[in-house]
Amino acid sequence: MLTFQAFIQSPGETFLNLGFITIRWYGLLISVSVLIGLFISKKLAKARNINPEYISEILPSLIIFSIIGARAYYVIFEWRQYSGENFFTSLELFNNAIKIPSFLAVWEGGIAIHGGLIGGLISIIFFCKSKKIHLKTFIDILIPSIILGQSIGRWGNFFNNEAFGIPTNLPWKLFIPIQNRPLEFINYEFFHPTFLYESLWNLLVFIFLILIFNKQNKTDFFRPGFISCLYLICYSFGRFWIEGLRTDPLCIGGLPPFCDGGIRMAQFISIFLFSSGLIGIFFLRLRTYIGKNRKNG
């Protein structure tokens, strides 16, 4: 009797191998995210009467600071992966293998979005101060592109066979090759596609933020900074629950896959960011309320 079993499977991390250079899906997706984000952010900047060229100007430093932050954050909490005999890895370039420190091999995966957000925020603060741009307005312009980039970038985890969830037999289950499975789940073939959950959630958040952005100038309810706060709330809410399914968490005081005796760092940060978003909205509304009373008084 024939049986049909549906599942998702990565075709591999390589998009194109030209012999002298290899293009990986992860790098390609990041590049696509940057180009789409550049286009969207310029449109949003123009809608807020901010010079769209500022987006092009900040882009190099934003990318560099975000990648450094994302990688540093991950390496700090997963140093055991990059120490000892794993300290070096090979970079194939023009048919030659060059040894480099493994923590520099970002294209192999291993970045943390919370670290990227910290690095990106530092870059934005410095840029806004140098150009004398209103910080909250400028961040509101960039935020939709950031969450869309997160949605696209999550597919890099799919191609790298990483950042997946606990075993499952759901129709949309993800097949993971044995060499990529945690030892605790070595005999399981199918796992939750947490990359897909987060990608879809982030896409919904992007659509929601764009709708709010288009209403921001029509009412004083959505003050500058409101979109940034909504991002913190919505993204953190989804990330908290999805993180609970993952088998590769960064842990404080524990070890993957369940951080026994400790806490999942991403969930801890999500609670902090969620709370920060709520507090931010409270103070934005308070300023609006005080401003109205002063006008009426």
Swiss-Prot record:
Keyword Nucleotide-binding: no
EC number(s) given by UniProt: 2.5.1.145
Gene Ontology CC terms, in alphabetical order: plasma membrane
Pfam families the record matches: LGT (PF01790)
Entry membrane topology: Multi-pass membrane protein
GO biological process: lipoprotein biosynthetic process
Molecular function GO terms recorded: phosphatidylglycerol-prolipoprotein diacylglyceryl transferase activity
Class in the EC hierarchy, top level: transferase
Binding site for a 1,2-diacyl-sn-glycero-3-phospho-(1'-sn-glycerol): R154
UniProt keyword Transferase, yes or no: yes
Cited PROSITE patterns: LGT
InterPro entries according to UniProt: Lgt
Transmembrane segments: 20-40, 57-77, 107-127, 133-153, 193-213, 225-245, 266-286
Keyword annotations from UniProtKB, A to Z: Cell inner membrane, Cell membrane, Membrane, Transferase, Transmembrane, Transmembrane helix
Places the protein is found: Cell inner membrane
Known pathway: Protein modification; lipoprotein biosynthesis (diacylglyceryl transfer)
HAMAP family referenced in this protein's UniProt entry, alphabetically: Lgt
Recorded family membership: Belongs to the Lgt family.
Function in brief: Catalyzes the transfer of the diacylglyceryl group from phosphatidylglycerol to the sulfhydryl group of the N-terminal cysteine of a prolipoprotein, the first step in the formation of mature lipoproteins.
Protein name: Phosphatidylglycerol--prolipoprotein diacylglyceryl transferase
Annotated source species: Prochlorococcus marinus (strain MIT 9301)
Gene giving rise to this polypeptide: lgt
